[in-house]
């Protein structure tokens, strides 16, 4: 096993957290100016429709979410490094708003194909993301950027009445993915940034991955 993985595992054992589960998100984030613009939209929605959830969630496009024991995190991150480095940067274009009746309002993603293809690459490490039969990774099939979710009926009805007529347009270059982690009772925090390097894909088998 290589020295990097050994150090990570030793650190987790020392803190006593590696046997506890955590929630993870792998996301794409807009550049700072667009991020701030979308954050303002979310803040306004939260104020106008008394929706604290819109204020809490930060702007991102989810690729996969999963729950897993923290002992598996080093292996998950190594698998993501190996798969994501094969990707090349691509443009994401967003236009206007959409909804999942009757609970979520989001920004439409126009350029979905490359995001879906990115998810396919990320799936290469799914065996490390499955905690048990009741906790399997959820890979996104309909990319979107959430403004507000878990809406009450009145929040959705009034919110969608307004946002279905609003205009929005934004674009950014996706050149990395960000892994976020949340332990019980905590907020999500970044744990690693995976840069799209357009490197030649290597055949990865479990023994090679861990240098066993």
Spell out what each predicted region is.
Residues 25, 104, 176:
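Short hydrophobic/aromatic beta-strand or adjacent loop that forms the aromatic wall/cage
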Residues 105-111:
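Short histidine-centered catalytic/ligand-binding loop motif
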Residues 98-104:
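Short, basic/glycine-rich phosphate-binding loops at helix/coil junctions
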Residues 102, 184-185:
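Short strand-connecting beta-turns/loops that link adjacent beta-strands
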Residues 1-91, 112-173, 188-212:
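Basic, often amphipathic N-terminal segments
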Residues 175-184:
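Short beta-strand segments and strand-loop junctions that repeat across beta-rich extracellular domains
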């Amino acid at each position: 096993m290589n020295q990097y993985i050994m150090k990570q595992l030793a650190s987790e054992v020392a803190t006593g957290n590696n046997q506890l589960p955590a929630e993870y998100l792998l996301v794409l984030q807009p550049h700072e100016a667009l991020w701030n613009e979308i954050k303002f939209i979310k803040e306004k929605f939260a104020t106008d429709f008394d929706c604290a959830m819109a204020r809490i969630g930060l702007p991102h496009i989810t690729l996969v979410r999963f729950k897993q024991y923290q002992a598996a995190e080093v292996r998950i991150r190594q698998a993501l490094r190996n798969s994501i480095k094969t990707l090349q940067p691509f443009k994401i274009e967003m236009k206007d708003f959409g909804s999942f009746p009757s609970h979520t309002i989001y920004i439409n993603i126009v350029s979905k194909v490359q995001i879906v293809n990115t998810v396919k690459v990320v799936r290469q490490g799914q065996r490390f993301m499955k905690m048990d039969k009741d906790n399997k990774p959820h890979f996104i099939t309909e990319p979107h950027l959430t403004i507000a979710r878990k809406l009450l009926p009145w929040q959705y009805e009034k919110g969608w009445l307004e946002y279905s007529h609003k205009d929005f347009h934004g674009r950014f270059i996706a050149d990395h993915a960000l892994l976020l982690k949340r332990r019980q009772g905590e907020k999500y925090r970044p744990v690693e940034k995976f840069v799209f390097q357009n490197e030649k894909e290597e055949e990865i088998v479990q023994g090679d991955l861990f240098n066993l």
